[in-house]
Amino acid sequence: MARTKQTARKSTGGKAPRKQLVTKAAKKCAPATGGVKKPHRYRPGTVALREIRRYQKSTELLIRKLPFQRLVREIAQDFKTDLRFQRSAVMALQEASEAYLVALFEDTNLCAIHAKRVTIMPKDIQLARRIRGERA
């Protein structure tokens, strides 16, 4: 049923004006949705919890290998040009980096929970790093 704009009217002391009712015939003529089914949506948080369980079970690397390798080479360019890396060296750097990030996010989550929140914020990361002694 279409909404109509309501305007203030001066009362004449009679009955209040009623909303117009749409007849059954008018409803049938109205364009239907065509029976289009809405896509299924999980409740908020369900998919997040499923992803948490999935990634806690797994041991594979979460950062793609080639973008990480490009990042390592880009950072190394600042120190010395024409550096070459063994594949195992890049893999060791990636393992260490991901282990560090996972531990940092765990501590960050604890800081957010301590503040009675479930959403992590930059200030939680800063607090976690400060408690660890990484950043004065």
Swiss-Prot record:
Q: List-wise, which residues carry N6-succinyllysine?
A: K57, K80, K123
Asymmetric dimethylarginine is carried by which residues?
Answer: R3, R18
Residue positions of the PTM Allysine? Answer: K5
Q: Which GO terms describe its molecular function?
A: DNA binding; protein heterodimerization activity; structural constituent of chromatin
Which keywords accompany this UniProt record?
Answer: Acetylation, ADP-ribosylation, Chromosome, DNA-binding, Hydroxylation, Methylation, Nucleosome core, Nucleus, Phosphoprotein, Ubl conjugation
UniProt modified residues of type N6-methylated lysine? K10, K19, K28, K37, K65, K80, K123
Q: Where in the cell is it found?
A: Nucleus; Chromosome
The name under which this protein is listed is Histone H3.3C
Q: What is the lineage of its organism?
A: Eukaryota, Metazoa, Chordata, Craniata, Vertebrata
- Tell me the name of the encoding gene: h3-5
